[in-house]
Swiss-Prot record:
Protein name: Beta sliding clamp
Gene3D superfamilies: 3.70.10.10, DNA Polymerase III, subunit A, domain 2 (3.10.150.10)
Family: Belongs to the beta sliding clamp family.
Record-linked InterPro entries: DNA_clamp_sf (IPR046938), DNA_polIII_beta (IPR001001), DNA_polIII_beta_C (IPR022635), DNA_polIII_beta_cen (IPR022637), DNA_polIII_beta_N (IPR022634)
A Pfam family hit: DNA_pol3_beta_2
Subunit structure: Forms a ring-shaped head-to-tail homodimer around DNA which binds and tethers DNA polymerases and other proteins to the DNA. The DNA replisome complex has a single clamp-loading complex (3 tau and 1 each of delta, delta', psi and chi subunits) which binds 3 Pol III cores (1 core on the leading strand and 2 on the lagging strand) each with a beta sliding clamp dimer. Additional proteins in the replisome are other copies of gamma, psi and chi, Ssb, DNA helicase and RNA primase.
Subcellular location: Cytoplasm
Organism domain of life: Bacteria
Phylogenetic placement of the source organism: Bacteria, Pseudomonadati, Pseudomonadota, Alphaproteobacteria, Rickettsiales
Predominant location category: cytoplasm
Keyword Nucleotidyltransferase: yes
GO biological process terms on file: DNA strand elongation involved in DNA replication
Organism: Rickettsia felis (strain ATCC VR-1525 / URRWXCal2)
UniProt function note: Confers DNA tethering and processivity to DNA polymerases and other proteins. Acts as a clamp, forming a ring around DNA (a reaction catalyzed by the clamp-loading complex) which diffuses in an ATP-independent manner freely and bidirectionally along dsDNA. Initially characterized for its ability to contact the catalytic subunit of DNA polymerase III (Pol III), a complex, multichain enzyme responsible for most of the replicative synthesis in bacteria; Pol III exhibits 3'-5' exonuclease proofreading activity.
Molecular function as annotated in GO: 3'-5' exonuclease activity; DNA binding; DNA-directed DNA polymerase activity
Length: 379
């Protein structure tokens, strides 16, 4: 039966990832548990929520091989509260799992391994590797505009697709569109799948982990599943959304009548300040643009009003340039602008306008492989 010795800090991190996968209110006990398998000097931790399956291997001292399942939440809560030290985990059979630390001991109820589902197999139609850094970039640049409307299920995730050596992520909620891509080293079969929001968030946490961020991630695609292999010791398998993502190219403005170039941080900070006055029912800020100034203003029902002026400047730290003699006043949901401005770390941001009712194209000169479209609102 299972017996192993492991460092607390090693176990904490893996349990954190596992706990994040498991649904907090899972009514099926088997899916609320984590499977622990000790073999060949490794502890494999398996967790699932039926749509998503995560397997992690960590190096431990295996005294005796074995496997069991135990409450993910309880085990995670205990280990997180323990000081850094060695832990001994022992399967005591009918009396459960013993967790023994320096000055403490816990006994947890277990369930048989036979009740825990295995990871599904996948027959990949396409597979490739990219750096975790690149993968994190395209997910972070698009995840915030995923639709939360469950009736539009085909928009409830990021659209991962391959076209002509470009690996692209896109998402939209009908009010905004986010697109980010990287170039692959070799030609791969064109493919497109919709990765659910939960799965996108979980794999993003894994690839951004310090031990993974400088490594590659292998991605295997089929029509209904996607498999991620990161650092060889972490495997995530996810179901895909069965739907068709809209042809987003039709929503990208092809022309504009005016262009704003501004310091990203100054613009973002100003919008965030002015947005404080807005109310949830109708969130809108107005941008009043001219060659000389940008005025950002808002009126909040039963709160008051606010205004901030940014002057024309060629200085990099306060850059503002509007290229039209025609002044423009246009409104936006401030959250939509804030999300875009926070997603891409760049000194400057470019906004391309056609008229007050047309969608606005947003680009970053230092990040040409990120494109955003935001619909304006009436103010």
């Amino acid at each position: 039966m299972l017996k192993l010795i492991v460092e607390t800090k090693t176990l904490v991190q893996s349990l954190g990832f596992a706990s994040s996968v498991v649904e907090k209110r899972n009514v099926i006990p088997e899916y609320a548990n984590i499977k622990l398998s000790a073999k060949d000097g490794n502890l494999e931790l398996s967790s699932t929520n039926m749509d998503l399956y995560l397997s992690q291997k960590i190096a431990v001292q295996v005294v005796s091989e074995g496997e069991l399942t135990v409450s993910t939440k309880t085990l995670n809560d205990i280990v997180r509260k323990l000081p850094d030290s060695e832990l001994t985990l022992t399967d005591l059979g009918t009396t459960g799992l013993e967790i023994k630390g320096k000055n403490c001991k816990f006994n947890l109820f277990t369930l048989p391994v036979s009740s825990f589902p295995p990871m599904d197999s996948i027959n990949p139609e396409a597979s490739f590797k990219i750096s975790c850094t690149d993968f994190a970039k395209i997910i972070e640049s698009t995840k915030f505009s995923i639709s939360l409307d469950e009736t539009r299920y085909n928009l409830n995730g990021v659209y991962l697709h391959i076209k002509d050596k470009e690996f692209c992520s896109a998402s939209t909620d009908g009010h905004r569109l986010s697109i980010s891509w990287v170039t692959l080293e070799k030609q791969i079969k064109n493919f497109g799948v919709i990765l659910p929001q939960k799965s996108a968030e979980e794999i993003l946490k894994i690839v951004k982990d310090p031990k993974n961020i400088n490594e590659d991630i292998e991605i295997l695609l089929s029509s209904n599943k996607i498999k991620f292999i990161c650092n060889e010791n972490t495997i995530m398998l996810s179901k895909l959304i069965d739907g068709t993502f809209p042809d987003y190219s039709a929503f990208i403005p092809e022309s504009s009548s005016s262009k704003l170039v501004i310091n990203r941080k100054i613009f973002a900070d100003s919008i965030e300040r002015i947005a404080i006055i807005t109310v949830e029912k109708f969130r809108a800020v107005k941008l009043s643009l001219s060659r000389e100034t940008l005025e950002i203003s808002a009126v909040g029902e039963a709160r008051g009003n606010a205004k901030e002026v940014i002057n024309s400047s060629q200085d990099k730290e306060s850059f503002y340039e509007y290229n039209s003699d025609e002044s423009l006043a246009i409104g936006f949901n401030p959250q939509y602008l804030e999300d875009v401005l926070k997603a891409v770390k760049s000194d400057l941001v470019e906004l391309y306008f056609s008229d007050v009712s047309a969608p606005v194209l947003i680009k970053f000169p230092e990040n040409p492989k990120d494109i955003f479209v935001v619909m304006p609102v009436k103010v």
